[in-house]
């Protein structure tokens, strides 16, 4: 699959915030946060990492140049190595990724992306439930025809139907 292949589902349906989490730049920013956290932990465990190096990484972590990384990857033929080289070149130090494998990085970052994505979904779901509750309150006395087995049934109110949907169990029972 080409690096420039468009993900139709993401392009059409994902929110800007979700695309920021799962996009190339978002992933790189999370990787850099991960590397900095690991370097700090390694230093606290006695590995010789100068404070200036950590400060340098922190000062350049938001400088993402996808084109430069892509050019490095064309030479290294390894995506993670290219991102390591880019970050080290920006910081002027070579202390990240000590003792790590590519999978250590990518698996942890993927878990962070999943967590951030779920947090975003939770926020949006809560906002939707609040809106539904507001509408249920506003239109609580509106009479409508209930349905059972997709057939019209007795009269009920919009408030009752909305409340039913708001209180459905979410654990699959």
Protein language model regions, located:
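Single conserved hydrophobic/aromatic residue that forms the stacking wall/gate
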Residues: 165-173
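A helix-coil-helix interface module used to build multimeric assemblies
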Residues: 2-166
């Amino acid at each position: 699959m080409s690096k420039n292949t468009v993900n139709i589902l993401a392009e059409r349906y994902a929110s800007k915030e979700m695309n920021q989490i799962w996009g190339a730049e978002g992933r790189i920013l999370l990787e850099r946060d991960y590397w900095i956290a690991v370097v700090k932990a390694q230093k606290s465990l006695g590995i010789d990492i100068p404070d200036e190096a950590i400060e340098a990484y922190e000062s350049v972590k938001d400088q993402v140049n996808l084109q430069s990384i892509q050019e490095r990857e064309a030479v290294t033929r390894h995506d993670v190595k290219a991102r390591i080289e880019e970050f080290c070149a920006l910081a002027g130090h070579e202390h990240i990724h000590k003792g790590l494998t590519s999978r250590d990085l990518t698996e942890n970052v993927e878990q962070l992306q999943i967590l951030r994505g779920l947090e975003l979904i939770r926020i949006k779901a809560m906002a939707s439930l609040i809106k539904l509750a507001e509408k249920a309150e506003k239109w609580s006395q509106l009479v409508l025809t209930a349905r059972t087995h997709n057939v019209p049934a007795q009269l009920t109110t919009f408030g009752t139907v909305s409340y039913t949907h708001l209180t459905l169990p979410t654990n699959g029972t």
